[in-house]
């Protein structure tokens, strides 16, 4: 169907007369650029008429233009005799075009757009990302792996393969989540239910765990055995999309077990934020802060960062490249305490400046060397690699990312019989606090000084690592009492006064927070008494730890520390 088939004849005649007059006038304004061997012109419309402000693009390039008030466009700077494929997109429509080649000089191009539904279909059945799910649909009703992975070329990591190893893909099966939810260790041993006592002033309040009974760490279900909570709102969003507070993440099935899965992310149309703060509303975690466009029966809908993916039922959504996309699951308030706030930390930093800053995607979805994101034999197109976002999304388990998060400068010298070590750590490469998100995460700075015989020098000044850094053998990761410090957001449970606490589903308060905000520096000084005659070696190490070591032991998690910075300095005593 072309742009005019649906008009009555009289309306068509009037429309064509007005359009022709407009085109004549606009041709005079553009003076000579309307028809040439280096331009293509035409009209973008839907069955009701022209569409203004539509983006027309030479597919896979940055050569684009915007339609005028009458839907007219002119694409410039084309190579003579070199055919191109054009696409068009406008808000509220699927991307159109993408099928016909046009030679420069063509002046009668017509691209018809189809409007997509402006409602969310709650009856939509999610598509699995995996071919192993067994469903093989037709067209775009297919699994993601089929077109977005290269099974016969492991050197090429397309989006499915990158996502498969990412924490988002593993969020529903994250054993730290599941054991913290159930109150178990990795072997399934469960801690006793929380004990309570009735008080005159405060009513029923919780008690600390019974020290005479086996304890395998905290658990949401130990404190709230009859509630599902809202963990699923972020960790199993496909399952929780319509039941954010009623989905138990340990019982989800099907696509829900795929975590933050492909189909879920590409059904996101917008994010609901508080206009005053720029943050999600406190009572709207995860899926509650997203606006979705699940398509009606017989249709599909994929929103993405390109406005030229055609043909197909795809559309462009600017939110896909904005940090606000990440806000619903990277900001969390429990009992009026801000527990995690990566998005807000970014928002408060210079990185949020739209002119000079960086988005979450700039750092966590940087382009790699791939020049296509869908298999070429499945309709994929060659593109500039710098326009394709990686789906590897490195985060707290990525060693390379962590080792490029902060800078550490050390000055070590002797004054008389004292070794003075000054350590400065600067968050100069990260757009939020370090560490961020889960309050279980922390950095441990460890300073050791030893003489030529390998004997450790006695610390005579400076802070030491607190008890919750681990009481025991330093060679096994128990660093309490050693020279150094910990960078962390420490929560304390209000009723039991347990701290540091990872059970932030309970009422807590922020006991302390000395994490490194963007572009801030922490400087600390340590002194050691020395009787060495020749040389002292100072070892300075900054490590990232996923959780408090006591909790790691209780849950039996396998979460090795990651060394972020490490320096050894020899100090001459002469």
List where the protein language model places each region.
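A short, solvent-exposed beta-strand micro-motif common in secreted/extracellular proteins
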Residues: 80-93
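Beta-strand-rich domain onsets/edges
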Residues: 25-39, 411-417
